[in-house]
């Protein structure tokens, strides 16, 4: 028996049972919910539904016990096969969005330089889509892997991402609408920072003053993840100093 699985599932079941009782959910409402979950599965939106309502809580829990930079939701558009890049992500020739320079450092909790660090960077196209997932956009556009310098520094040029709507034509979008919500995410850039012997940091950073920054449909925005509105010579700057922590044992790793 996996005690960790039992403890978590028992707690989830107890919480749902408590809400069913407190809200006096009827048999008809219960059956509607069961049918809804079947629709979610049939339309392959299980991951989307869970990400919208629960992923930010998992990220916030990790942030609470972490000594490193603030983690955030990964989202569904990460690809491990992104190409290595030197100083620029590949973008459309027709992309006339404001240039963006992402730069900063990666350090350990004690401030020391970490060896052999790579950073995955990915963000939306100017029309709110992701390479390798939408419209046959080549997988090497708007994403790449950076090798961090021996001094812990990195920099890469790209263009500004845009706010976009998560898929909202299926049951997840219908539920958000029924609840009076919406399906918009603020513009952001994703990062995954990896180094041998260290916890992988998965996070995303946002832009001060951006649309939907205070009303993200996925509740993913934390104040520590919002970068200030700094523009130099027509280039928006995103300055980030990542802090990563030593790897630790994972709860429930052994059955």
Curated annotation (Swiss-Prot):
State the source organism's domain of life: Bacteria
Q: Tell me the route in metabolism or biology where this protein functions.
A: Aromatic compound metabolism; 3-chlorocatechol degradation
Query: Which keywords, in A-to-Z order, does the entry hold?
Result: Aromatic hydrocarbons catabolism, Dioxygenase, Iron, Metal-binding, Oxidoreductase, Plasmid
Protein name listed in UniProt = Chlorocatechol 1,2-dioxygenase
Tell me the protein family, please: Belongs to the intradiol ring-cleavage dioxygenase family.
Task: From the UniProt record, list the reaction(s) this protein catalyses.
Answer: 3,5-dichlorocatechol + O2 = (2E,4E)-2,4-dichloromuconate + 2 H(+)
- Amino-acid biosynthesis is among the record's keywords: no
- Record function comment: Preferentially converts 3,5-dichlorocatechol as opposed to other chlorinated catechols. Retains diminished activity toward non-chlorinated substrates.
- Residues binding Fe cation, per UniProt: 130, 164, 188, 190
| InterPro entries assigned to the protein according to its UniProt record, in alphabetical order | Catechol_dOase_N, Chlorcchol_dOase, Intradiol_dOase_C, Intradiol_dOase_core, Intradiol_RC_Dioxygenase
Q: Which CDD domains match?
A: 1_2-CCD
**GO biological process, any:** catabolic process
As recorded in UniProt, its EC number(s) are 1.13.11.-
**Span of the signal peptide:** none
One Pfam family from the record: Dioxygenase_C
- An MF annotation (GO) of this entry: catechol 1,2-dioxygenase activity
The top of its lineage is: Bacteria, Pseudomonadati, Pseudomonadota, Betaproteobacteria, Burkholderiales
Cofactor, how bound (note): Binds 1 Fe(3+) ion per subunit.
List, separated by semicolons, the cofactors it needs: Fe(3+)
């Amino acid at each position: 028996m996996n005690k960790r699985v039992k403890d978590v599932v028992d707690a989830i079941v107890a919480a749902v049972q408590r809400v069913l009782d407190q809200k006096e959910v009827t048999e008809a409402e219960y059956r509607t919910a069961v049918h809804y979950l079947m629709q979610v599965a049939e339309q392959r939106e299980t991951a989307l539904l869970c990400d919208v309502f629960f992923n930010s809580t998992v990220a916030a829990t990790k942030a609470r016990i972490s000594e490193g930079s603030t983690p955030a939701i990964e989202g569904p558009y990460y690809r491990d096969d992104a190409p290595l890049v030197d100083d620029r992500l590949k973008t459309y020739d027709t992309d006339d969005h404001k240039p963006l320079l992402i730069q900063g450092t990666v350090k350990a909790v004690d401030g020391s330089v970490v060896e052999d660090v790579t950073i995955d960077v990915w963000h939306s196209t100017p029309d709110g889509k992701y390479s390798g997932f939408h419209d046959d956009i080549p997988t090497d556009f708007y994403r790449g892997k950076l090798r961090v310098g021996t001094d812990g520094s990195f920099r890469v040029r790209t263009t500004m991402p845009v706010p976009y709507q998560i898929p909202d034509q299926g049951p997840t979008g219908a539920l958000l609408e029924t609840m009076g919500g919406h399906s918009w995410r603020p513009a952001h850039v994703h990062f995954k920072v990896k180094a041998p012997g260290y916890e992988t940091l998965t996070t995303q950073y946002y832009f001060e003053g951006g649309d939907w920054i205070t009303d993200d449909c996925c509740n993913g925005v934390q104040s520590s993840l919002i970068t200030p509105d700094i523009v130099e010579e027509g280039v928006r700057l995103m300055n980030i100093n990542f802090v990563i922590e030593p790897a630790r044992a994972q709860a429930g790793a052994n059955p």
